[in-house]
Amino acid sequence: MRREGTTRLHRTFLLRVYLKESAVITYPASKKIYCQGKIFPTIRVGMREIQLTNGDSLTLYDTSGPYSDPNISIKSPQGLPRLREPWIKVRPRKTQLAFAKEGVITPEMEYAAIRENQKRELKKNTDQERERRLQGNSLSARIPNPITPEFIRNEIACGRAILPANINHPESEPMIIGRHFLVKVNANIGNSSLTSSVEEEVEKLIWALRWGADTVMDLSTGKKIKEIRETILRHSPVPIGTVPLYEALEKVDGDVKALTWEIFRDTLISQAEQGVDYFTIHAGVLNRFIPLTQKRVTGIVSRGGSLMAKWCLLHREENFLYTHFTEICEIMRAYDVSFSLGDGLRPGSIADANDEAQFAELKIQGELNRIAWKYGVQVMNEGPGHIPLNLIEENMTKQLAYCREAPFYTLGPLTTDIAPGYDHIGSAIGAAFIAWQGCALLCYVTPKEHLGLPNKQDVKEGLIAYKIAAHAADLAKGHPAARQRDDLLSQARFEFRWHDQFNLALDAETARLFHDETLPKEAAKHAHFCSLCGPKFCAYKTSHEVRDTLQKVT
């Protein structure tokens, strides 16, 4: 006992040292600002404000939480400030969906609305022709300007959006997932039986927040699963998701046959008590669908899907996640945990895309959605996978139809199988396309996909690729807050304001590094050219001269 206590104290000390020395997130030319609520005036929504050299500023959606506020001290093991605790204490124990159906706007809903607008309502664009030309094609989506708390309430009530916020995760900053809002990006972290400590997982979490992860899934499969999850939850300002099946399997030492509903149920309750915001539940992998995967090139590639398929065959019984689904709903309702209905039969190769097994499970997901809604539980649906570009639209169309417009959450999809080491690029192409079609949450893919456990650089590259995909989709959809950053960066580029170009970029450090490889001196940051064209062939420089000439003759 003494040895275990000493070890725990040592881990707490290491985490405290890490948080003190490394856990401050900084962005160039930026400061943390807070926007006040109107319905709930005590609400303070954290945003990032970039200051530009010409006096302009840009307010951005910020996933970094208290880590980017130098005025907040983060202590371990207590973790982050318990932002939502006062709201939770003074109201009935209901889900966000239940409140929404009753017509009640919660503080979480107003908080999410303020984040979505990014102070866009304060900026007016007078070029009406440009606005009409670039207004975007939201397809069947309806995106108001501005986005109001009432609109968010209605979207949740209709099942078209979720606000994942377990009552036992008060540290989380409310956010909304749905096709009528900014496209969100999920990052996966977690240890394996071979790697990682508690401190390393917290470091991964903060690193993912730094690069814009809107949600994080803890997919730990090794030892200390519960301890790692507890520490992540206490230090996370974004919703945390898990696959409870992984911990349940650890409890039986990986013996699939020994897994029971009772073991899974207890695991579910334990994780809900800790504060997990959404669970991936592979309840759509049914006995009758398993033979449909026999002719596939890559079989069943979902870890949870393959485990439940094996369990069904070993026991010659139906999937207990399906047969006990209403009991799962009751547990999740008690804590306001959201469903992320797993796509256990998703295609793992282009050859298997859009096959019978995949869409059979999707139909069952739709049936389960309706049961979850009946119990007042929020739900989103997970999707593929490996899909060629020409088949992506069918996935989105069928999901909207089968699942009654519940949020879609996809892994990519990867648009080709030939890019090991570059799967983050191949999948970001598919992610941008399906997000424009209506996908609400994109699970990032890193360069290590199919090859190994990603390191910090892989996490960064995966998130950057997916933030680009999400933003491209927001532009295409015509989200009212999407284009501000593009316009300001383009103006800075045309006016040779190099520092503003760097600071407005998704990755300012890399942009500055690439520029400085050939023109490192400070004087080059004011030059009217870069090393690509030089001073004589810069099109922007020439364009300025053309404008000056036109002004003189007119």
From Swiss-Prot:
An annotated GO cellular component: cytosol
Binding site for [4Fe-4S] cluster: 530, 533, 538
GO biological process: thiamine biosynthetic process; thiamine diphosphate biosynthetic process
Residues holding substrate: 188, 217, 246, 282, 302-304, 343-346, 382, 409
Function: Catalyzes the synthesis of the hydroxymethylpyrimidine phosphate (HMP-P) moiety of thiamine from aminoimidazole ribotide (AIR) in a radical S-adenosyl-L-methionine (SAM)-dependent reaction.
Family label: Belongs to the ThiC family.
Name the record gives this protein: Phosphomethylpyrimidine synthase
Organism: Coxiella burnetii (strain CbuK_Q154) (Coxiella burnetii (strain Q154))
